[in-house]
C-alpha cells in the first residue's frame, strides 16, 4: 500500500478528520486555507512520514528510529543515579514538549523493559507507542477504565515516567520554567511506596512559542493555542544535542506531613532544576 502523505487513505494524522470527528459543524465552517495552514504548522506530512516509514516498529525501537531520522543526539549525566532495581517515578521538567519525552523514553528503555508514560489522550492515536503510553484524560464511559489502568500500573513493577507540569515550559519575566508541578505524583508515590528519581532536561522552544503563549494568556484566551505549534517546535530541533541529568533517588518516606503534597511537588521541582548545574559548560 502507498504510504506517502499524499495518499489520503493512508493518513495516520489527519487534521480534517479530527475536526470532522470532534466538531462536524465547525469543520464545515473552517475555510480550506485554514485547514491547510493547520496541516503545515503541525507538520502533518512529516509526522505521517515518520510513522509510516517505521510502521512495523513499536515502543523503544520506534523511538530510536525517530531520533535517528531527526538526527537528535543527547548526553546523559548522572547515569549512575538510575537504580538497578525497585519501583520508581522518574520525573522531570518539560522544556520542549516532544523531544524531551522521546529522549526520556529512549534512555530509560535501555535500563528497564517495563516503562510506562502517562500522556494526553490525543497521543494514544500513535499506535507505535501502545506498549508505553497510558491515557490520563479519558472522558465519559472510558474514564473509569483509564483510572483503573493507571492505578494498576502504579501498583505494578513498571517504571513510571512523568512530566508533573503537564504542559511544557513557558517563559515568564525572561525566565523559561515549568508551570506548577501537580501534586498527584507525590500522593501516588506515597500510596504505592515508589521512590522518586528527579531528572532535568536542557533545551528551549522558540521566542515565537513563548510570546504566543504570553499573548494568549494576556488576552484571557483559555485554549492553549500555542500547543498547535509544538510539532513545528519539535522539527526545529533537528540535528540538535540535548542534555539529560539524573539526580539521586528520593525515598518516598521523605514526603512526610511537614509539607503538603503540593509543597513537596514544588520541592522536587526545585531538586530537578538544581541538576542543571551538573551540565558542563
Predicted regions mapped to residue ranges:
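Short, basic, glycine/proline-bearing loop/turn elements
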Residues: 91, 129-138, 165-173
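Non-catalytic C-terminal accessory region of glycerolipid acyltransferases
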Residues: 2, 11, 15, 146-281
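Active-site pocket-lining segments that scaffold enzyme catalytic pockets across diverse folds
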Residues: 94
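Membrane-anchoring hydrophobic helices of lipid-metabolizing enzymes
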Residues: 1-91, 101-103, 110-112, 130
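Glycine-rich, phosphate-binding/catalytic loops in enzymes
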Residues: 106-109, 178-180
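Conserved nucleotide-cofactor-binding alpha/beta core module
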Residues: 109, 113-155
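Short gly/ser/thr-rich secondary-structure transition/capping motifs
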Residues: 70-76, 142-144, 226-228
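Short, flexible loop segments at the rims of nucleotide/cofactor-binding pockets, characterized by
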Residues: 52, 65-71, 136-142, 174-175
Amino acid at each position: 500500500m502507498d504510504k506517502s502523505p499524499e495518499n489520503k487513505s493512508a493518513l495516520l494524522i489527519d487534521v480534517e478528520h479530527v475536526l470532522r470527528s470532534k466538531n462536524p459543524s465547525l469543520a464545515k465552517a473552517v475555510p480550506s486555507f485554514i485547514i491547510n495552514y493547520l496541516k503545515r504548522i503541525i507538520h502533518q506530512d512529516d509526522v505521517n512520514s515518520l510513522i509510516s516509514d517505521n510502521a512495523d516498529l513499536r515502543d523503544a525501537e520506534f523511538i530510536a528510529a525517530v531520533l535517528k531520522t531527526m538526527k537528535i543526539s543527547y548526553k546523559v549525566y548522572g547515569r549512575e543515579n538510575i537504580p538497578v532495581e525497585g519501583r520508581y517515578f522518574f520525573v522531570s521538567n518539560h522544556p520542549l514538549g516532544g523531544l524531551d519525552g522521546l529522549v526520556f523514553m529512549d534512555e530509560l528503555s535501555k535500563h528497564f523493559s517495563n516503562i510506562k508514560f502517562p500522556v494526553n489522550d490525543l497521543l494514544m492515536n500513535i499506535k507505535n507507542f501502545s506498549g508505553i503510553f497510558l491515557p490520563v484524560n479519558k472522558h465519559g464511559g472510558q474514564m473509569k477504565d483509564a483510572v483503573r489502568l493507571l492505578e494498576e500500573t502504579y501498583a505494578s513493577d513498571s517504571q513510571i515516567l512523568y512530566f508533573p507540569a503537564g504542559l511544557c515550559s513557558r517563559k515568564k519575566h525572561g525566565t523559561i520554567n515549568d508551570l506548577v508541578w501537580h501534586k498527584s505524583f507525590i500522593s501516588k508515590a506515597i500510596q504505592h511506596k515508589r521512590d522518586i528519581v528527579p531528572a532535568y532536561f536542557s533545551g528551549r522552544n522558540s521566542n515565537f512559542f513563548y510570546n504566543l503563549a504570553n499573548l494568549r494568556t494576556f488576552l484571557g484566551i483559555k485554549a492553549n493555542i500555542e500547543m498547535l505549534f509544538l510539532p513545528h517546535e519539535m522539527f526545529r530541533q533537528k540535528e540538535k544535542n540535548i542534555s539529560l541529568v539524573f539526580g539521586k533517588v528520593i525515598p518516598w518516606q521523605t514526603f512526610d506531613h511537614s509539607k503538603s503534597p503540593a509543597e513537596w511537588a514544588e520541592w522536587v521541582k526545585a531538586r530537578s532544576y538544581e541538576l542543571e548545574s551538573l551540565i558542563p559548560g
